[in-house]
Amino acid sequence: MSRTLVYAIGGNALSSPSGDDEEKAALVLAKVMSDVVDLLEAGWRVILTHGNGPQVGHLMSLDPSLPMEEWVSATQGMIGYSLSITLESILRRRNRPEANSVILTRVEVDPDDSGFKFPTKPVGPILNSQQVMSEDWDIAETVNGPRRVVASPEPLRILDIDIIRSLINQNAIVICCGGGGIPVVKRDGHYAGVPAVIDKDRVSSKLAIEMGVDALIISTAVDAIRTGFATKSEKIHRTLTIDQAKMYLKSGEFPAGSMGPKVASLIDF
């Protein structure tokens, strides 16, 4: 019987935070999709999710008048298409029969989530003194430099999970929950979008748990987890126990908006 996994691809693995070297990003994407086909050949069924931090921030800066959640939905289509067409090419080249499908995915959040009050999710490129920045932007220092940060509430429910389950049960490769999913809240019995970017690792963990999959993979643009980052005591960790991960997370080794959500998501799973 086939095993199933959720494979979360980082937005920075698809496009660098500085916004350059798109040719290199395309090569990385092709390598990731080749890895996905390797998993299929090893007997796994694969659900793909992806980030959108660099891409959604760039689009938001082009037209700030559009609601943030609409830009999230736009990146689901744009990045989903890129993943799909790259994956399709590799599938055909390696004589694989699987179809793939991109699902526009809505994710319910709590309108009173503290994430709306304390923005932590980096979006867009690394900022410099030459770039135009709005006065109402929240800016935070990341490991690569200053970036805009936006609200990032916790995912409560994946509204389109039944469609995802149906497709994976037909042995399709499902691309879903792009950019953490389109954030919506329930008002008067109806769903409405809200301005936020849900962390894709948090929703990937939620998806993995609700789908009852066998494994969760979170890929990153870095080679390993580190504690004491950028200090003399920096240490590389190739493996961590759950207890170690909890200890380091609690002590603040993994910052919000970076490695923190990844470690927390893997602990939850």
Question: Could you say what each language-model-derived stretch is?
Answer:
Residues 17-20, 62, 186-190, 229-231:
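Short acidic, glycine/proline-rich loop/turn micro-motifs
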Residues 64-174:
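Ligand-binding beta-strand-loop-alpha-helix segment within the catalytic cores
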Residues 10-14, 54, 179-182, 222-223, ...:
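Short connector loops/turns at beta-strand edges and beta->alpha or beta->beta junctions
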Residues 53, 57-65, 230-231:
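Glycine-rich loop at the start of a catalytic domain that most often binds anionic cofactors/ligands
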Residues 6-8, 45-58, 99-104, 174-177, ...:
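Short beta-strand segments at enzyme active-site cores
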Residues 27-37, 68-86, 90-91, 151-168, ...:
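Polyanion-binding loop/helix "lid" in catalytic or ligand-binding cores
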Residues 1-49, 58-60, 166-171:
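N-terminal glycine-/serine-/threonine-rich phosphate-binding loop
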